[in-house]
Amino acid sequence: LIKIANLPFVDQIKPVVGYTRTSSLEYSDIDPSSRDFDYGNALEQIEQINVRELHEQGYTGNGVRILVMDTGFSLTHNSLLGINVIEQWDVLKNDQETADETEQEVAVNQDYHGTAVLSTIASNAPGEFMGVAFNAEFLLAKTEDVAQEVQLEEDNYVAGLEWGEENGADVVSTSLGYLDWYEYSDMDGNTAVTTIGVDIAASLGVVCVTAAGNSGSSSWYYIIAPADADSVISVGAVDDNDIIATFSSHGPTSDGRIKPEVCARGRQTWCVNPNSNTNYSRLSGTSLACPLVAGAAALIIQARPDWSAMEVREAMMMSASNADNPDNTYGYG
């Protein structure tokens, strides 16, 4: 290790630590019989963030490219069959298959989380379920191993970001976060590998949206990396009455900045049931709130293609319900 560390192109060597991951989602299977308008079950969560008005003006994500990085993606559900997937990359195996490939992956539901997340942006099943940016183009990157959490996954995350930027991503949605090898003092916007990565991506013009984290009722309490980045849109979770979910992580960052930036439905959020090709479910977590906001960002980009990533971020914050009095629970609303 000493010899490697002394090589001129090596900046630093860090130990790899890990722990077994537990699911951050609460599951409740629902029969798809409850429908309302063309949005189906998605109506309330779409109206809650004022997306319906944008759709009615013709902004549905057309021509905007969204990178979704997660645990993997199954595209066999009826509402996902026709979505416009441009490229896929399994960073773990370095191939182009992001759905479950092995018996082990099937056993642990590897692509479950990513499929649910993707569906809230991309689904296109009028009368049943519609995503926020259903006409967008999608890049899908599988960066996470659900069986464990290791620091290598931050490198996978950054590799996915680089791949997405090289392939023309306008928006990145990442319902992922890292804290187990960090202290709260590291949530300063300049320390975590993924935090640095999203700031670089934003500087290159990519609107970066990430989940704030589900630590609000734990001893950690605060947002997790990369939600501490100063250029990211971190997203907290609220219920259908706009009340913050108890699990939603809070700010501030360790250097005093307000977090999260905004909130969306993350309590009993409608999505596809990843274990079915026809049914829908309600899941809870900032993981579900994040893609709703990422989809909204794509609509803004379609409407204002000349805006920078930071201008899109500012527009979302300044037009949110709490913009006049932002705090470390709801952010700007």
Residue positions per predicted region:
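Autoinhibitory propeptides
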Residues: 1-46, 52-55, 230
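Subtilisin-like serine protease catalytic core
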Residues: 42, 53-153, 167-170, 203-205, ...
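Substrate-binding/access-modulating region of protease and related hydrolase catalytic domains
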Residues: 55, 60-62, 124-127, 140-231, ...
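Alpha-helical segment proximal to the catalytic Tyr-Lys
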Residues: 235
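Carbohydrate-associated surface elements
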Residues: 238
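Internal glycine-rich alpha/beta core junctions
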Residues: 248-271
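Short, small-residue alpha-helix embedded
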Residues: 289-305
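Catalytic cores of secreted or luminal carbohydrate-active enzymes
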Residues: 331-333
